[in-house]
Amino acid sequence: MAVPKRKVSKSRRDSRRAQTFRLEAPNLSPCPNCRTPRLPHRVCPNCGYYQGRVVIQHEAEAAE
C-alpha cells in the first residue's frame, strides 16, 4: 500500500486544491438585436429576443 513519504503542509495542500475550485468568467456574447452582452443560448434580458423572435414581452412594450 502507498504511504506518503513526508507530511504535506496545509498551505501546499490548499494551494493544490485551489486549482480544482477555480471559477471561470461567464462566456458572454452580444445580442444580435440590441448588442448588449448576454449568455449564449438564452433569451436577451434587455430586449427579450431569442433567435430573431420576441420571447419575453417587457412591461414598457406591453403598455404601448
From Swiss-Prot:
Entry keyword Ribosomal protein: yes
PANTHER family named in the record: 50S RIBOSOMAL PROTEIN L32, LARGE RIBOSOMAL SUBUNIT PROTEIN BL32
Keywords from the named record: Ribonucleoprotein, Ribosomal protein
Annotated GO MF terms: structural constituent of ribosome
Pfam families noted in UniProt: Ribosomal_L32p
Protein name: Large ribosomal subunit protein bL32
Gene that encodes the chain: rpmF
Highest taxon listed in the record's lineage: Bacteria
InterPro entries, A to Z: Ribosomal_bL32, Ribosomal_bL32_bact, Ribosomal_zn-bd
Family recorded in the similarity comment: Belongs to the bacterial ribosomal protein bL32 family.
Region (Disordered): 1-21
GO cellular component: large ribosomal subunit
The keyword Ribonucleoprotein is annotated on this UniProt entry: yes
Biased composition (Basic residues): 1-15
Gene3D superfamilies hit by this protein: Single helix bin
Signal peptide: none
GO process annotations (BP): translation
